[in-house]
Amino acid sequence: MSKITEEEIQQILPINGPSFEEVKNYLYKYNNEYIVIKCGGSVLIDQNLFNNFINDISILNKLGFIPVIIHGGGKRISNKLNEAGIKSDFINGLRVTDEKSISIVEDVLNEFNKEITEALKKNGCDGQGITNKQNNILFVEQENQNLGFVGSPKEISQSIIEQIVSKKKVPVIAPLGLDKDNQVFNINADTA
């Protein structure tokens, strides 16, 4: 079933939650299934939420599920842009990413990616970063000229995810992609 014992599962279950038997049936049914989890940037900057998130991912992994993480970076990106004197504009909830801001967006997302993989490792769960610089899987087209360097995924290289999973690692995806000219684009984590 999984890498976790019945006793460990009992310790994880909420006091007023489902019985072990109910959970066991669910575990057998969905064992070895991919679970794609989007983690917003606000979770990543609140240490308590971040620690809970990392713990939950580790538990899912121990239970035999295959978590795949895609993360955002919203608030930290806004803070870094403000520090650089760059105003954040949004159109329909999407950050306008111009030539000045794309490198800051890229740096923040790659930094978060590294922090997540390191935290997973400290929690006994191997993570593998997927960024535009390392194992890029997202190939994009520009979403809209008014948004600047914001892309829409057109192709996803699933083979890289499968290779990482075959090594018993959790893929951690930064929402960045490359176009046909290898230009970096910011991607809304909800659509990546």
List PLM regions with ranges.
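Nucleotide/pyrophosphate-binding catalytic subdomain
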Residues: 1-192
